[in-house]
């Protein structure tokens, strides 16, 4: 599937409450690829599987955009390789501990121990969350 990269951006605040009829629209050009992928050589896309990050707005089947050039900070959402297995979690950096936190109460905090092999693969920058039930071109589900 080919997506048009240049599209029109209608600049206006969108009220979630009562709309203001006096608000005017401005039209600008927006290159979606430049917005979401400022560093193409270090940007990767992942299809999310599972529900451990729903509290962060990341749902099963979403498209996660990840930049490998960014430095992970405390509370960054990261792609991590933990003992060779890939996962998406929130990075928790404390004075003497490193942990990977899920954003769902059914998933425990993973405290990193010296016996664990942790590699921070990249930092999540955007999530594309479909608002319709139509199949997405990146979906892993049939």
Cite the ranges covered by each PLM segment:
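Short, hydrophobic/aromatic-rich segments at coil-to-beta transitions
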Residues: 41-43, 73-78, 99
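Short, positionally conserved secondary-structure boundary motifs
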Residues: 1-54, 85-86, 93, 97, ...
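Structural motif
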Residues: 61-62, 76
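Catalytic Cys-His active-site segments of thiol-dependent hydrolases/isopeptidases
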Residues: 99-105
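Hydrophobic beta-strand signal
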Residues: 65-66, 79
């Amino acid at each position: 599937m080919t997506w048009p990269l240049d599209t029109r951006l209608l600049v206006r605040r969108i009220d979630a409450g009562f709309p203001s009829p006096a608000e005017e629209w401005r039209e600008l050009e927006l290159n979606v690829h430049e917005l979401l992928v400022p560093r193409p050589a270090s940007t990767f896309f992942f299809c999310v599987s599972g529900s451990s990050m729903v509290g962060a707005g990341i749902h099963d089947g979403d498209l996660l955009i990840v930049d490998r050039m960014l430095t992970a900070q405390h509370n960054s959402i990261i792609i991590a390789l933990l003992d060779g297995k890939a996962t998406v979690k929130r990075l928790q950096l404390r004075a003497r501990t490193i942990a990977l936190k899920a954003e769902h109460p059914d998933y425990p905090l993973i405290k990193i121990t010296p016996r664990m092999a942790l590699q921070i693969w990249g930092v999540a920058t955007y999530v594309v969350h479909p608002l319709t039930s139509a199949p997405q071109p990146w979906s892993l589900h049939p």
